[in-house]
Amino acid sequence: MSLLTEVETPIRNEWECRCNDSSDPLVVAASIIGILHLILWILDRLFFKCIYRLFKHGLKRGPSTEGVPKSMREEYRKEQQSAVDADDSHFVNIELE
C-alpha cells in the first residue's frame, strides 16, 4: 500500500469558506484594515522615491537665501539636485559651510 492512499485528501467542500456570519463587525473591520494595508503598501512600493524625497528634502527648509546673490543660489540648487540624483537608491545631502 503506497503512502498516497494513506494521506487524507481534502474534498472540495472543505476548501470553501465556513464563515457564514460575515456580517460580524470584527470580520468587517479586519477586512477593511487588511484592504487599506494592502493599498498603502502598494502605493509605498510604487512611489517610495517620491515620498521619501519629499519627507527628507521637501519638509526640511534649507538655509535662508536672503542676501545671497542669485548665481550662488542657482549653484547651490544645482549641487543639491546633483547630490540627490547621484545615487538612485540612496539620497545624499551635502551641507555647505
UniProtKB/Swiss-Prot annotation:
Membrane-topology annotation of the record: Single-pass type III membrane protein
Record's keyword annotation contains Transport: yes
GO MF, one annotated term: monoatomic ion channel activity
Keywords: Disulfide bond, Glycoprotein, Host cell membrane, Host membrane, Host-virus interaction, Hydrogen ion transport, Inhibition of host autophagy by virus, Ion channel, Ion transport, Lipoprotein, Membrane, Palmitate, Phosphoprotein, Signal-anchor, Transmembrane, Transmembrane helix, Transport, Viral ion channel, Virion
Lipid attachment, kind S-palmitoyl cysteine: 50
This protein's record includes keyword Cell division: no
Subcellular localization(s) per the UniProt record: Virion membrane; Host apical cell membrane
Activity regulation, short description: The M2 protein from most influenza A strains is inhibited by amantadine and rimantadine, resulting in viral uncoating incapacity. Emergence of amantadine-resistant variants is usually rapid.
Domain notes: Cytoplasmic tail plays an important role in virion assembly and morphogenesis.
Oligomer status and interactors: Homotetramer; composed of two disulfide-linked dimers held together by non-covalent interactions. May interact with matrix protein 1.
Family: Belongs to the influenza viruses matrix protein M2 family.
Additional remarks: When the channel is activated, one or more imidazole moieties of His-37 probably become bi-protonated.
Protein name: Matrix protein 2
UniProt source species: Influenza A virus (strain A/Hickox/1940 H1N1)
